[in-house]
C-alpha cells in the first residue's frame, strides 16, 4: 500500500525490486501523491464552479437571456461530467475526493459568486476567466500525469482541456462584440 498526500491508502499494481521505482507505465508513489493532490483541487474547483454557474443561470439578465441561460446550463452539465470523472479517478488511485462545500472552498482557486443580479456580459466574462484558470491548472496536471506515465489521467484531462479550449474561444468571440 502507498499513501496519497491526503493520507489515504491506495493499492499500487506496480512491483519493483527498487524502492520508489515502478513498473513501466505505472507512476511511482510520489507521482501518484502529486497527481492526487492536483485532482483533489480540480474536484474542489469544479464543485465551486458548478454552484457559480447555477447562480449565473438563475440570476443573469439582459437582451439575450434565453440563449445565455441555456448556454450556462450546457456549461454546468459539462462541469458535472468533469467533476464526476475526476472524483472517480481519485478513487481509482485509492484517494478520497473532497465532498463538502467546506472542503471545496478550502481547496479551490475559484471564488464564490454572491452577487444576485448579474448582467450577461459580466457573467460571461467571469465564466471565461474561470475557464481560463481551469485550463491553466488542468494543463499543469496534464504535464505531471504525462511525465509520470499516468496515461489514464492524461487522457481524462486532455478531454477536459479540449472542452475548455472551445468554450474559452467561443466566450472570447461572444465578448468581443
Swiss-Prot record:
Domain of life: Bacteria
Transmembrane residue ranges: none
GO MF terms, alphabetically ordered: ferric iron binding; oxidoreductase activity, acting on metal ions
CDD domains the record matches: DPS
Similarity annotation: Belongs to the Dps family.
Subunit-level organization: Homodecamer.
Protein name, per record: Antigen TyF1
Amino acid at each position: 500500500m502507498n499513501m496519497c498526500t491526503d493520507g489515504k491508502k491506495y493499492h499500487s499494481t506496480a512491483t519493483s525490486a527498487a524502492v520508489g521505482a515502478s513498473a513501466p507505465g505505472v507512476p511511482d508513489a510520489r507521482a501518484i501523491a502529486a497527481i492526487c493532490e492536483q485532482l483533489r483541487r480540480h474536484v474542489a474547483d469544479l464543485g465551486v464552479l458548478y454552484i457559480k454557474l447555477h447562480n449565473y443561470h438563475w440570476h443573469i439578465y439582459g437582451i439575450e437571456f434565453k440563449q445565455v441561460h441555456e448556454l450556462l446550463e450546457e456549461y454546468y452539465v459539462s462541469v458535472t461530467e468533469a467533476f464526476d470523472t475526476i472524483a472517480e479517478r481519485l478513487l481509482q488511485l485509492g484517494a478520497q475526493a473532497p465532498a463538502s462545500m467546506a472542503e471545496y472552498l478550502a481547496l479551490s482557486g475559484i471564488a464564490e459568486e454572491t452577487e444576485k443580479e448579474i448582467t450577461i456580459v459580466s457573467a460571461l466574462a467571469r465564466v471565461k476567466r474561470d475557464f481560463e484558470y481551469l485550463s491553466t491548472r488542468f494543463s499543469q496536471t496534464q504535464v505531471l500525469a504525462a511525465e509520470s506515465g499516468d496515461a489514464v489521467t492524461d487522457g481524462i484531462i486532455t478531454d477536459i482541456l479540449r472542452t475548455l479550449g472551445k468554450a474559452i474561444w467561443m466566450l472570447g468571440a461572444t465578448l468581443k462584440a
